[in-house]
Amino acid sequence: MVNIVDSGSKHAPQEMEQFLPGEGKVMYKIQPRKSDTEQALAGNDFDPFALRDNPHPTTDNETLTHLLKASLGTGILGMPFAFMCSGLIMGIFSTIFTAFICTHCSYVLVKCGHKLYYRTRRTKMTFAEIAEAAFQKGPKWCRGFAPVAKFSILFGLFLTYFGTCSVYTVIVASNFEQLISYWTGTAVSLRMLICIMLVPLILIAWVPNLKYLAPVSMVANVFMGLGLGITFYYLVQDLPPVEERESVVWSTLPQFFSITIFAMEAIGVVMPLENNMKTPQSFLGICGVLSQGMSGVTLIYMLLGFLGYLRYGSATGESITLNLPIEEWPAQTVKVLISLAVYCTFGLQFFVCLEIIWDGIKEKCKKRPTLVNYVLRTVLVTAAVVLAVAVPTIGPFMGLIGAFCFSILGLIFPVVIELIVHWESGFGKYNWILWKNAIITLCGIGALVFGTQAAIKDIVKAYSNNENVGE
C-alpha cells in the first residue's frame, strides 16, 4: 500500500515511519502509491465540475438567455391556434402539463449525465455520449445497443436542427417578401431573398462559441419580446366575454399537444448549454436555470394562447401574425422584429449541428483546427441555404421530421436512459420511476402518432396548391 522513496531531508515522521529502524527514518520517506491516489479519486474525491476545462464558460444568466431563446421560437406564434384546438380552460392545464413533461425530460437527461460523469470519470458529455455511456454501464443485455443509441441520437439531432436552420431561412425570407410586396406592390422572388441571406447567416455562424453568442441571443430575446409585446397590444383590444369561447374541446386535443410539444421542445440544446456553463450544478434544482427558464416560457405560452384564441375565436390563424392587420405599421413592425429574432436564433440552432459534425472530425484536424472549423461552418450554412432555395416549402416536411425526432429524442430517449442508469440501484418505492416513465413514454408515442398525422396533412395542403412557390 505504500512506496518507500529515498529522502535526504528531514521531515515530520508519518505513522508508518515510527516502526522503521532509526536509519530508515533518515534514509526513507513514506508516500502513498499512485494506485492509492487513483483509487481515492474513483470515490467522492472526483469532481467533474471542478476539473472541467472551458476556455470561455457561460454564466448562469447567459445560459438562461440561451435557454429562453431556444424555447421561445416561432412555435409560440401557433399557441392561439393550439388553444382553439383545446379550449380556453383545457388549454391552460394542458400547457402546464406539456411544459412539465418537456422540462422533466430535460431534467432527467442532465441528471443522468451528472451521474454518468462520476461513473465514467468524464467532465462533460453530449446527449449522444450520455446515451452511449448509459448503455455501456447498464445491464449486460443492453450494452450491445450502445453504438446504435449514440448514432440514432446524433442522426436525429442533426437532421432536426439542420432542417430547422433551413426553415428559419425560409421564415425570415417569407416575412420580408410579404412586406416588400406590400410596400412596393410588386412580387419579389422568395428564392432570391433566401440567397441574399447567405452572407448574414455565415457571419452569425462564425461566432466562435456560446459565450460570445450570448449577446446575440439577448438581442433575439429583445426582438421577440418587442414583437410579442405589440402582438399582445392587438390581442387585448375589444376582448369578448370568456363565455363566447369553448372551454374544453376533446376532438382536436391531440393536435394541441403536437403543436405545443414541438414548440416548447429544446432537448438538443440542453447538454451544449450545460457543458459550457461555469457552474453546471446551477442548471438543475427548483430555482435552477432550467426551472427558471421553463417557468417563464410556460407563462408566456399560456398568456399568448389564451388571449389569442379569446380575441379571434374560430378565426384564429395557424400563426397569430396572420390575424394582425398588415396595413397597419405596428403589425408590419411585428413581422420585422420576429424575422430579426429568428435570424439571431439561427446561431444557437446551428451550434447543435456544428457540434455534432465537429466532434466527429476534430481529432483528424489537429494541424489547422481553427481553419477547418470555420470552413465547416461555412459549408454547413451554405448547404442549409441551398436546401431552402431548392425546397422553399420545406416547412411541412420539417414538421414531419420534428414530429418523429422530437417525440423520440425529447420524450422517449431521456426516460429510457434514466431506467438504464437506475437499473441496478432500483426504481424507488413502488417502482415509481418505472411507472412515471411508462406514462411519459405513452405521451411520446401519442405525440409521435398525432404529430405525424398533422404534419402529413400540412404536406398535402401545401402541395395541393397549384401556385408556384418561390417564383
UniProtKB/Swiss-Prot annotation:
Coiled coil: none
InterPro entries in alphabetical order: AA_transpt_TM
Keywords from the UniProt entry: Amino-acid transport, Cell membrane, Cell projection, Cytoplasm, Endosome, Glycoprotein, Growth regulation, Lysosome, Membrane, Neurogenesis, Transmembrane, Transmembrane helix, Transport
Transmembrane intervals: 81-101, 153-173, 187-207, 216-236, 253-273, 283-303, 337-357, 375-395, 397-417, 432-452
Any Gene Ontology biological process: dendrite extension
Entry membrane topology: Multi-pass membrane protein
The organism's place on the tree of life at top rank: Eukaryota
Phenotype of null mutants: Severe dendrite growth defects in class IV da neurons which normally have large dendrite arbors, moderate defects in class III neurons which normally have medium-sized dendrite arbors and no effect in class I or III neurons which normally have small dendrite arbors. Induction of starvation response and altered protein homeostasis in class III and IV neurons. Severe defects in axon growth with mutants showing no defects 48 hours after egg laying (AEL) but severe defects apparent by 120 hours AEL.
Keyword Translocase belongs to the record: no
Tissues where the protein occurs: In third instar larvae, expressed at highest levels in the brain and digestive system with particularly high levels in surface glia of the brain (at protein level). In third instar larvae, expressed in all cells of the body wall (at protein level). Within the body wall of third instar larvae, most highly expressed in epithelial cells and sensory neurons. Expressed at a similar level in all da neurons (at protein level). Widely expressed during embryonic and late larval stages.
Assigned GO CC terms: axon; dendrite; endolysosome; late endosome membrane; lysosomal membrane; neuronal cell body; organelle membrane; perikaryon
Entry keyword annotation includes Glycoprotein: yes
GO molecular function: amino acid transmembrane transporter activity; L-amino acid transmembrane transporter activity
Residues with attached carbohydrate: 61
Pfam families: Aa_trans (PF01490)
Cell location: Cell membrane; Lysosome membrane; Late endosome membrane; Cell projection, Axon
Function in brief: Amino acid transporter which has pH-dependent electrogenic transport activity for alanine and glycine but not for proline. Plays a role in positive regulation of growth by directly or indirectly modulating the effects of the TOR signaling pathway. Required in a cell-autonomous manner for dendrite growth in neurons with large dendrite arbors.
Similarity comment: family membership: Belongs to the amino acid/polyamine transporter 2 family.
Descriptive protein name: Proton-coupled amino acid transporter-like protein pathetic
Organism from which the protein derives: Drosophila melanogaster (Fruit fly)
